[in-house]
Amino acid sequence: MSEENVLIGVIGGSGLYQLDNLTVVKTVNPETPWGFPSSPITIAALPSGTKVAFLARHGIGHVIPPSSVPSTANIAALKSLGVSAILSFSAVGSLREEISPGSFALPSQIIDRTKGIRDSSFFNGTSIVAHAMFGDPFSNKLIRWLEPRVRKALEKEGKGKLLFTDKTIVCMEGPQFSTRAESVMYRQWGGDLINMSVLPEAKLAREAELSYALIAMATDYDSWRPHSDAVTAHDVVQTLHDNGASAKLVLSTILDDLHTTINTHHRALTNGNSQDLEAIREEEALLQERGSMKFSIMPASPQQKAEDRKKLAFILPEHFKDAA
């Protein structure tokens, strides 16, 4: 594991780290047992010294389609740098009239419409079985922490952009957009948003015991409106450009505060410092996923291969101490 004090990982477009108040410290490309990440990871620092790791989900220049994103390597690489919480930014289609293009959302639930093409578990292909809890696919405490701060940042921007919470996002396989029939069906299922990126990211973050939240940016109305043209990539890119500026403002507003909060929780959970423990009681601990895989992994047995335990120790050293 890296000695870098990088507690926050940001996954999104390659331009997200180009903030006025960020200085690039270094670029790293860690090799993991699942290969290399989508792109080299940029470690940047705020004037305060807070470091953040930025990863371009679709590669530099957006060259990797949704079904081919190496999400296992992406999450493992971020964890290897010391990351404890991931903020994932993604363009989404809106399945609700009130969530107009340009709006932001912090979803709380996912409907999985991927097709099994994507590797969705670190345990796949190993001799070790695990069943991670996924009833709440996003980190609820992190979302509650983010909500007032993201809302305040958008209000400060003054463009009238709204923030929605407690929404359900549908993750489709892609790369094609929905048919009109599918889009209408997703609305009937209770879907509010749709994208191609949140899975398997959220599942893998849970297995790696990382807090994970999706900051969704609505770019279009998908294809459910009967009298509107179906969504095109051109529509998405046009709105995404404006949303990108808003995303940068959100990041520059919250990163220092989030780093300080996570650092306090780390100290409290690691050292049991009474002052820090009191601080995280007052403001709920963000690192709720830490230790969550303890009872999800099947007990060690002679049938489990040593090389598999060593592989999984890369992301879960606490649970595979004999192999780390």
UniProtKB/Swiss-Prot annotation:
UniProt pathway annotation: Amino-acid biosynthesis; L-methionine biosynthesis via salvage pathway; S-methyl-5-thio-alpha-D-ribose 1-phosphate from S-methyl-5'-thioadenosine (phosphorylase route): step 1/1
Main location: cytoplasm
Enzyme class: transferase
Site (Important for substrate specificity) residue list: S178, A233
Keywords assigned by UniProt, alphabetized: Cytoplasm, Glycosyltransferase, Nucleus, Purine salvage, Transferase
EC numbers on record: 2.4.2.28
One function term, GO molecular function aspect: S-methyl-5-thioadenosine phosphorylase activity
PROSITE patterns: PNP_MTAP_2 (PS01240)
Gene3D superfamilies: Nucleoside phosphorylase domain
Positions of phosphate binding: S14, R57, H58, S90, A91, S197
Entry coiled-coil feature ranges: none
Residues annotated for substrate binding in this entry: M196, D220, Y221, D222
GO terms, biological process: L-methionine salvage from methylthioadenosine; purine ribonucleoside salvage
Catalytic activity: S-methyl-5'-thioadenosine + phosphate = 5-(methylsulfanyl)-alpha-D-ribose 1-phosphate + adenine
A single cellular component GO annotation: nucleus
A Pfam family recorded for this sequence: PNP_UDP_1
Compartment(s) of residence: Cytoplasm; Nucleus
Superkingdom assignment: Eukaryota
Subunit structure: Homotrimer.
Known function: Catalyzes the reversible phosphorylation of S-methyl-5'-thioadenosine (MTA) to adenine and 5-methylthioribose-1-phosphate. Involved in the breakdown of MTA, a major by-product of polyamine biosynthesis. Responsible for the first step in the methionine salvage pathway after MTA has been generated from S-adenosylmethionine. Has broad substrate specificity with 6-aminopurine nucleosides as preferred substrates.
Similarity-based family: Belongs to the PNP/MTAP phosphorylase family. MTAP subfamily.
Protein known as: S-methyl-5'-thioadenosine phosphorylase
Organism in which the protein naturally occurs: Coprinopsis cinerea (strain Okayama-7 / 130 / ATCC MYA-4618 / FGSC 9003)
Lineage: Eukaryota, Fungi, Dikarya, Basidiomycota, Agaricomycotina
